[in-house]
Regions:
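Extracellular glycan-modifying ectodomains
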Residues: 1-185
Length: 185
């Protein structure tokens, strides 16, 4: 989860020509045992060796996050939230407080107008916190729940970079492919 996302972040930084933070620069917090969605869906043996969910807090100390909740209200949130109180299969709520249709993250330590949009499903949640140290604004869209047009968002917010962070299984889901296709046209 977090460590795999870190390696994805390093790859993005290399492509952008920016220096990634070393993993040792981040404050690490463990939130207890975790099983992934796919394993949870199998109703498999719950006594196997479980993974432990760890999250790495952004280096920057002036990061704020707002997101659109299920009722459409914009609320304050945390890029990394304490998920220790959640069940073993819900620990992933530590990242961006879960799968929200639309999230805006602001880093007040960055004074330029750098911005990006991350189009993702839940697999992208763990990667976004690493990006927060490099952009003044990050717009996060979970295309499964968002109903806007990506081109309008990019134009209206003057977004400079677009990242698609998804797992491979979305490519076999015609509904999700169709929904994403509608948003990017």
């Amino acid at each position: 989860t977090s460590k795999g996302a870190y390696y994805g972040y390093v790859g993005i930084c290399e492509k952008l020509g920016i220096s990634p933070h070393a993993l040792s620069e981040y404050e690490k917090k463990k939130f207890g045992s975790f099983i992934g969605t796919y394993y949870g869906d199998t109703n498999g043996d719950k006594n196997f060796r479980k993974d432990e969910l760890a999250a790495y807090y952004p280096v920057s100390d002036k990061i704020s996050m707002k997101y659109q909740n299920e009722s459409g209200k914009i609320v304050n949130g945390h890029v990394i939230a304490d998920s220790s109180k959640y069940g073993i299969s819900n620990k992933y709520l530590a990242f961006l407080e879960g799968d929200n249709a639309y999230t805006v993250i602001t880093n007040k330590n960055i004074k330029d107008s750098s911005s990006c949009v991350v189009v993702k499903e839940s697999f992208g949640n763990a990667l976004v916190p690493y990006l927060t140290d490099h952009f003044s604004k990050i717009y996060v869209i979970d295309y499964r729940y968002w109903n806007g047009k990506l081109s309008h968002l990019v134009k209206d917010k003057k977004i400079q970079k677009i990242f698609f962070i998804n797992n491979i299984s979305m490519t076999r889901n015609s509904y999700l492919v169709g929904k994403l296709n509608q948003q990017i046209r």
